[in-house]
Amino acid sequence: MRVRVHPRVQRRHSDVEEDDVIVAFEGTLRSRARDTHPIQWVGVGLDRKGRLLEYIAVEDEPDGWLVFHAMLVTRAVLAEVGLRR
């Protein structure tokens, strides 16, 4: 599986590095598809520092993903993926 992180992520969230996003994506705890076209996946995973990150990604090639949003997890995303009421 190939995971790419859009440069915009680090420009907007300087505390989140590309490797953090990849580790969180590959170790996803919970994710769900959004009703969009193309289908966007919102997910939550732990980064290499043990922080809980949220991400939004699209499959942009066979077995290839582009993460275009990532940051420290919010309550809204925890609820969206079913990890919080």
Predicted regions span which residues?
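Ribonuclease/tRNase effector modules and their secretory precursors
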Residues: 1-85
